[in-house]
C-alpha cells in the first residue's frame, strides 16, 4: 500500500517556531514508521506563501509579500535539516510548477461546473484565518482568541 504523509503547509509570515517543529516531527515519526514496515511513503511539507497573514506581516515590516516569503521559506527548510526530518519533497506555493498545477486543477473544477460566482458574508479573523459562526463571536464582534475586531 502507498501512503501520502503531509504536514500543514506553514505560513511564512514569521520565522519557524516550536509549533512548526512539533507537527513536522509527528508527521516524520509516522513516515519513518510506515517505511520501517516496508510501506511506500511520500512525505511532503512546505510553505503557504499566500494569504492575508503574509500580506499583513509584509506590510508591517515594510516589504513585499514575495520578499518576506523569500526570506523566511529557507528558514523553514533549515528547520527540517536541524531536526533531521526525512521528507521527500518541500513545496513552496509560489513555485511556478506548483502555480501551474493548481491553475490546471482549478480550471478542471471550473469546467465541470463546480465553481460559480456568488457572495458570502461572515465574521472573519485574519489571525485565525477562518470565518467564525455567530456562536463563536465574543462581545463587541471580536475574536474570542485574539481579541481583535472581526
Predicted segments — roles?
Residues 1-150:
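N-terminal, positively charged nucleic-acid-binding surface of large information/translation enzymes
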Amino acid at each position: 500500500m502507498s501512503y501520502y504523509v503531509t504536514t500543514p503547509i506553514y505560513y511564512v509570515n514569521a520565522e519557524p517556531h516550536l509549533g512548526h517543529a512539533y507537527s513536522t516531527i509527528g508527521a516524520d515519526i509516522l513516515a519513518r514508521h510506515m517505511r520501517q514496515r516496508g510501506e511506500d511513503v511520500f512525505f511532503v511539507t512546505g510553505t503557504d506563501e499566500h494569504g492575508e497573514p503574509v500580506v499583513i506581516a509584509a506590510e508591517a515590516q515594510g516589504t513585499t509579500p514575495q520578499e518576506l516569503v523569500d526570506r523566511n521559506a529557507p528558514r523553514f527548510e533549515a528547520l527540517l535539516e536541524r531536526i533531521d526530518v526525512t521528507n521527500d519533497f518541500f513545496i513552496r506555493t509560489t513555485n511556478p510548477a506548483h502555480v501551474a498545477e493548481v491553475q490546471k486543477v482549478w480550471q478542471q473544477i471550473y469546467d465541470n461546473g463546480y465553481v460559480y460566482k456568488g457572495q458570502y458574508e461572515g465574521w472573519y479573523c485574519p489571525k485565525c484565518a477562518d470565518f467564525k459562526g455567530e456562536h463563536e463571536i465574543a462581545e463587541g464582534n471580536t475574536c474570542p482568541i485574539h481579541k481583535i475586531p472581526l
